[in-house]
């Protein structure tokens, strides 16, 4: 256990504050060491029995504050369950540290139980792979373990030229794996001197210039940067919008305040009415929003396009139409010479909200567009919201409008999987406090083990789960799929009582029968201050038709922008 304690304490000195622990024997030294550090208030320890769910829980916790969260698992198949969360951490640039126990080299390739080639399981999704000594980390000097911790921390945080992401530390342990209480008390009195973690140096060259005196447009995609950089990013964008007068097409995930100037509300319904010359400039921030219409619109555009990312140098332009620069918005605007301080009049906007309110009244049967329109208004201002990476994130982009800016919206669109949806939300709520999750039924069922975190934690996360139950994969209803086997091949409806499943985990729930009951149900759910489920049933076929009808009708509303 001494080596495990040395390693974990070195990570704590770098800044590790939270660790999610999964059960196992080979990982016993790490578990015991984590318990010692937790007893000394050096580490917050969370336990979880499902490694896949645990990794997503940790990823949600890391995303909430932009800090590394560690996961500890035993050896064997347990390690393979970390891959989905590692992939999402890679693509969404979130720091995650995966500590896996392993057998020593003497037990490798000889048929020993629970011994697999786990070193290679996560390689493709990780920023860095590190390994303890093959004979067991007990053979390593403290300096070597300290250096391993510092290197892992740097890589997870995005040191050098790479963005934050997942790091895999594979740690062989030789028996004996477990220590006596007396030995633990002796080890707990030891302490390591702090070792500094050097700051990364960006080393980024000059970026393409854009002319604020000429026409242009800003497309703000999902925010994918460090939490500490967000305020500077917002201020830089605010300045550019005032200087240029360019319209802003903002994704709900862009982490922008509602008073951001020049914002076009419900822009996805009005792209064809934007009054811009063919050679207008385009400033794109971060990844693409989840809009095929925007993609087609940008591909038709003939003017220069600049894509700015927040420290991620990897290619992020699936349209292949933009010059990419990874220095961040704040650094880019600082490079633009001779910017005038005068503020241009903001662009004309066509607010479709009054029209949408007549089309989507807060009464009658539940529909997905109506929920996307009303929930941002009815949920308390500044309550964070997580949107499942399926229909909810797309519906809020299209129908949510101005009120989306009242909430910091999250959605794990790095790899856009629905796996881990509930566990991710639990992790966010554990660190952010009260949070609402908007999800479909398949995404929730796919990660139903996430409900385990409702009862395993000492203080259950205050999470309000808004389940849009439309009997299967509603996202497929919006695609041009023509097959007689649509229900069984694509929609895949499941015969599961979601309220009963939640209740089996001690989670209270209610059914919302109509939109008139929504406001009272939200108030009840938020008052619980713990995980709670609201089930809202809709008809996905009817909702798909409603979306088409509203899109067509919106073309006749208002004038050219």
Curated annotation (Swiss-Prot):
The name this protein goes by in its record: 2-succinyl-5-enolpyruvyl-6-hydroxy-3-cyclohexene-1-carboxylate synthase
Family indicated by similarity: Belongs to the TPP enzyme family. MenD subfamily.
This protein's UniProt keywords: Magnesium, Manganese, Metal-binding, Thiamine pyrophosphate, Transferase
Superkingdom in the source lineage: Bacteria
InterPro entries the UniProt entry points to: MenaQ_synth_MenD, MenD_middle, THDP-binding, Thiamin_PyroP_enz_TPP-bd_dom, TPP_enzyme_TPP-bd
Reaction catalysed by this enzyme: isochorismate + 2-oxoglutarate + H(+) = 5-enolpyruvoyl-6-hydroxy-2-succinyl-cyclohex-3-ene-1-carboxylate + CO2
Cofactor notes: Binds 1 thiamine pyrophosphate per subunit.
Pathway connected to this protein: Quinol/quinone metabolism; 1,4-dihydroxy-2-naphthoate biosynthesis; 1,4-dihydroxy-2-naphthoate from chorismate: step 2/7; Cofactor biosynthesis; phylloquinone biosynthesis
Necessary cofactors: Mg(2+); Mn(2+); thiamine diphosphate
GO biological process, one term: menaquinone biosynthetic process
Encoding gene per record: menD
Pfam families per UniProt: TPP_enzyme_C, TPP_enzyme_M_2, TPP_enzyme_N
Biological function: Catalyzes the thiamine diphosphate-dependent decarboxylation of 2-oxoglutarate and the subsequent addition of the resulting succinic semialdehyde-thiamine pyrophosphate anion to isochorismate to yield 2-succinyl-5-enolpyruvyl-6-hydroxy-3-cyclohexene-1-carboxylate (SEPHCHC).
One example GO MF annotation: 2-succinyl-5-enolpyruvyl-6-hydroxy-3-cyclohexene-1-carboxylic-acid synthase activity
EC number: 2.2.1.9
